[in-house]
Amino acid sequence: MTKVVVCALYKFVSLPHFESIRAPLLAMMEQAEIKGTLLLASEGINGTVAGTQEAIEALLVWLNSQNGLDNIVHKLSFDDEMPFYRTKVKLKNEIVTMGVEGIDPLKVVGTYVKPQDWNALISDPDVILVDTRNDYEVQIGTFKNAVNPVTETFREFPEYVKQNLDPAKHKKVAMFCTGGIRCEKSTAYLKEQGFDEVYHLEGGILKYLEEVKAEESLWEGECFVFDNRVAVNHDLKKGQYDQCNACRMPITEAEKQSPAYVQGVSCPHCIDKISDEQRKRFVERERQVNLAKARNEAHIGSDVNQVIEARREKKEAQRRLAAEKNNAKKSQVL
């Protein structure tokens, strides 16, 4: 039975005294045993956290009681295991970093399109559909016919727009991201650049997967998420991907069979990109993680390693159990 509720939330709102919110918010989360990270800035709040249903409900009630933080946009998904191992509330300059001064979604933003209306919009041949996420996210799943800007960070998105999009040529632009927050800024940026008809998926991919039936969906693949689940499928359950602890790229079970894959050290995506010094450091980190595991201790920075290792052991145990049952059946037949 699924016990962990994962809550992705954000809200753009003027928070001039956001620093004062950090301590009570962190205390509330720790008391409720909520794990994950929330970001606070003068422009609002953003993050993903996880806990019991009661804990997440309590957090939303607490936030709703704070001036300006009521009616926060949030999406819920579920997991059998806690995807975070720490509780953090960080103070930032931006809750999602684009690095462009003066972009304010509270002043100007694109047109929100509900998940139920999204298919009709992106099926319009006059609409250019742009995935605002990073390349490694796009690689494991995106909408049919979406353009991949091939960015490594969201900071690179404005340059992509300057080089590839033209208000005179691209009359209708639709954009999407994981939960909606990056599109708040990307659509605001396009509006500032003179684009007229700019649309974005309200609630992001996660809301679309929640509300649109798989048989009607135009989504292809899985959706990358920034926690130890790595990706979720159309049912918002953990998908088939793990993550390379060296480069953080999502990897498949097939890629883990490659000679280039060394747990905690390298994978087919980064084997030719990491230096000898990095390789030595990763080998030592993996050694320390294994030593800590043998002593039943938590190694700093090993959250992802721990979850991946736990899931790996769980899969192996399931395989052994299935093999034993199969052998038992064969013995009975004989």
UniProtKB/Swiss-Prot annotation:
Superkingdom of source: Bacteria
PROSITE patterns linked to this entry: RHODANESE_3
HAMAP family, sorted: TrhO
Gene3D superfamilies: 3.30.70.100, Rhodanese-like domain
Documented EC number(s): 1.14.-.-
Enzyme class per UniProt: oxidoreductase
GO biological process assignments: tRNA modification
PANTHER family linked to this entry: RHODANESE-LIKE DOMAIN-CONTAINING PROTEIN 7-RELATED, THIOSULFATE SULFURTRANSFERASE/RHODANESE-LIKE DOMAIN-CONTAINING PROTEIN 2
Coiled coil: none
Function: Catalyzes oxygen-dependent 5-hydroxyuridine (ho5U) modification at position 34 in tRNAs.
CDD domains reported in the protein's UniProt record: RHOD_YceA (cd01518)
Record-given protein name: tRNA uridine(34) hydroxylase
Active site: 177 (cysteine persulfide intermediate)
Family statement drawn from the similarity comment of this UniProt entry: Belongs to the TrhO family.
Stretches assigned to the Rhodanese domain: 123-217
UniProt cross-references to Pfam families, sorted A to Z: Rhodanese, UPF0176_N
Entry keyword set: Oxidoreductase, tRNA processing
MF terms (GO), sorted A to Z: oxidoreductase activity, acting on paired donors, with incorporation or reduction of molecular oxygen
Catalytic activity: uridine(34) in tRNA + AH2 + O2 = 5-hydroxyuridine(34) in tRNA + A + H2O
